[in-house]
């Protein structure tokens, strides 16, 4: 590993339909084995279902709100002090918030049995928009864990 400098962040161009960078990142997370066109079809049809089900005029704003509802604010990180390992609550960086929310939404959409990815993704986005479902439960569990370990907050980095 080179010690000179860290790699530069590359700018991601917006997606072709909505021009949104966040949606393009979401498509990249859905993509498997480099098949971006398949991922785009899945995401766009899921967004279409999502918009129709909730009667949204601007689907992108609805997607943003669903993503915002899924973002964690606090998480716990392991910190070794002496011989003991403590779960220390830490505020989540904004880039990581987006990343975790997207990962959780996609993970729970894939785990829905008997449904195609498009239907599962649309259902999970609707649930996030309405502040319910597996992704929101995961977020609440993460917050609950951080709250339970608040006593170790002074072990921050």
Swiss-Prot record:
It comes from the Bacteria. Signal peptide: none annotated. One of its GO terms (cellular component) is small ribosomal subunit. One of its GO terms (biological process) is translation. InterPro entries: Ribosomal_uS7, Ribosomal_uS7_bac/org-type, Ribosomal_uS7_CS, Ribosomal_uS7_dom, Ribosomal_uS7_dom_sf. Keywords: Ribonucleoprotein, Ribosomal protein, RNA-binding, rRNA-binding, tRNA-binding. One of its GO terms (molecular function) is tRNA binding. PROSITE patterns: RIBOSOMAL_S7. It holds the Pfam family Ribosomal_S7. SUPFAM superfamilies: Ribosomal protein S7. One of the primary rRNA binding proteins, it binds directly to 16S rRNA where it nucleates assembly of the head domain of the 30S subunit. Is located at the subunit interface close to the decoding center, probably blocks exit of the E-site tRNA. HAMAP family: Ribosomal_uS7_B. Belongs to the universal ribosomal protein uS7 family. Part of the 30S ribosomal subunit. Contacts proteins S9 and S11. NCBIfam families: rpsG_bact (TIGR01029). This is Small ribosomal subunit protein uS7. It comes from Chlamydia pneumoniae. The gene is rpsG.
